[in-house]
UniProtKB/Swiss-Prot annotation:
It comes from Artemia salina (Brine shrimp). GO terms for cellular component: mitochondrial inner membrane. Its EC number is 7.1.1.2. Core subunit of the mitochondrial membrane respiratory chain NADH dehydrogenase (Complex I) that is believed to belong to the minimal assembly required for catalysis. Complex I functions in the transfer of electrons from NADH to the respiratory chain. The immediate electron acceptor for the enzyme is believed to be ubiquinone. The gene is ND5. It is a multi-pass membrane protein. Belongs to the complex I subunit 5 family. This is NADH-ubiquinone oxidoreductase chain 5. GO terms for molecular function: NADH dehydrogenase (ubiquinone) activity. The keyword Transmembrane applies. Keywords: Electron transport, Membrane, Mitochondrion, Mitochondrion inner membrane, NAD, Respiratory chain, Translocase, Transmembrane, Transmembrane helix, Transport, Ubiquinone.
Length: 59
């Protein structure tokens, strides 16, 4: 009986903490994504990616 109550409480904690953690991570991720895809950074990232690809192809 005590095990069942503990299990229920544990599930409730996970259920409660899960969405808020996911929401926090997605919020942080989307703000980072929008920061990186804003115009100057997009150019910088694309140019650095192209440069590294070019260097790997030359090596």
């Amino acid at each position: 009986m005590g095990e069942l109550l503990y299990h229920e409480g544990d599930c409730g904690w996970v259920e409660e903490a899960g969405p808020s953690l996911i929401h926090h991570n997605s919020l942080r991720g989307s703000s980072l994504f929008s920061f990186l895809t804003s115009s100057p950074y997009k150019v910088l990232i694309l140019s650095s990616l192209l440069f590294t690809l070019f260097m790997y192809s030359m090596a």
